């Protein structure tokens, strides 16, 4: 029996919709990263983008466990010597772009490189309940039903 290797032309990509309301950020990010890479498929091939297109709504209502909301810090560098800025998860979630916490969590679970950047392009995260991808008819996945630990009362 020969080892199967998917070709980019053979891959069919599905659209998946996930509602992040009340879901734990890290647990959601692992499931999304696995879907983006295509590791949930029996035809997974490491060097081919065979994952799904994932839409996440209500990202601002995702939950961090423990004291991570106040204690987890995100760093960014301005490009100038000594100009490292830091913000807590709370500041980001209450700020202008609350979806960035979830984007960063998923981004750090995807391999860095050209294929990883393509796979991250298949992720769309929205802070509210509205999204412009109704025409793609995404399949809704209920992450809370997969495991009781995936959800947390805020």
From Swiss-Prot:
It comes from the Bacteria. GO terms for molecular function: mRNA binding; structural constituent of ribosome. GO terms for biological process: negative regulation of translation; translation. GO terms for cellular component: cytosolic large ribosomal subunit; ribosome. InterPro entries: Ribosomal_uL13 (IPR005822), Ribosomal_uL13_bac-type (IPR005823), Ribosomal_uL13_sf (IPR036899). The keyword Ribosomal protein applies. It holds the Pfam family Ribosomal_L13. Keywords: Ribonucleoprotein, Ribosomal protein. Part of the 50S ribosomal subunit. This protein is one of the early assembly proteins of the 50S ribosomal subunit, although it is not seen to bind rRNA by itself. It is important during the early stages of 50S assembly. Belongs to the universal ribosomal protein uL13 family. HAMAP family: Ribosomal_uL13 (MF_01366). This is Large ribosomal subunit protein uL13. It comes from Bradyrhizobium diazoefficiens (strain JCM 10833 / BCRC 13528 / IAM 13628 / NBRC 14792 / USDA 110). The gene is rplM.
